[in-house]
Amino acid sequence: MSLATREATHSLALSEPLPLTRHPVAVYLNGLATGSRPTMKQALDTIASMLSGGECDALTLDWAKLRYPHTAAVQAELVARYESATAQKMMCALRRVLTEARKLQLVDAEELVLALELPKIKSTQRLRGRALSGAEIGALMSVCASDETVQGTRDAALVAILRGAGLRRAEVVKLELADFEPETGALEVRRGKGGKDRTVYLPQGAITFVEAWLEVRGRTPGALLCPIRRGGHLEMRHMTPQAVLLILQKRAERAGVESFSPHDFRRTFCSDLLDAGVDIVTVQKLAGHASPVTTAKYDRRGEEAKRKAVQNLGF
């Protein structure tokens, strides 16, 4: 759906390209973590397309020309089109871009205040994602173990790390060999979400799979997990987050496991630790969440956990 007339489309397009150092979108994206940039760029491309009838993207729209009628229309359309969490994230990107436009002196402060004076988007409280069952995780590991190629060994280590440490895929692909301590199972996560470092620990079973991969990979410094070319040739460079998604999709299909996202391993990690009686603050620290409130949102134990909990009440 377009929010623009032909006349409005023309008026919102940049008359000439801006240097990237003066472009509010470029400045905003440059301040984000590398893994967050594609998602937020896509969000801004979508908003630019809505406002211009498909004629502009994030870099060709003149964001400094946006006023309250534009931002209000965008928010209304996003709320109608997406889940509340997605709409909130996209509006956050819009707000940040307009704020950068103000800092770059492209828009008047008063106009910015008016443009951003919008009602809060109400959360639908609908849970996203799911937790994987033990049987599903076992099936994924079995498929990897039955693959006698180096890809099978690497993918088993990948699943073991995602399941055993609950890392984000952007974090797992940045791991270096030096970040893994075999004796304790410690993994040093450097510059995770929010630029924070943390230490997590793999259970013994997961350590075994990582060690098996290192027997194939060798001890050359560099990426802990790396791409593999045809013929089983290892490339000593980091994998991409997209590669992790594709690997998991392929393994899930072969294992007969229902569709899931890489992030569902984090939900499973948090849910299983909470189910095992680990306090929520410890789970929060392991997951790298800024608040235990965020950790609680990852709990996918469902009704069975509540049923078990009340059995502790005495009568």
State what each model feature region is.
Residues 1-315:
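Conserved catalytic core of the tyrosine transesterase superfamily
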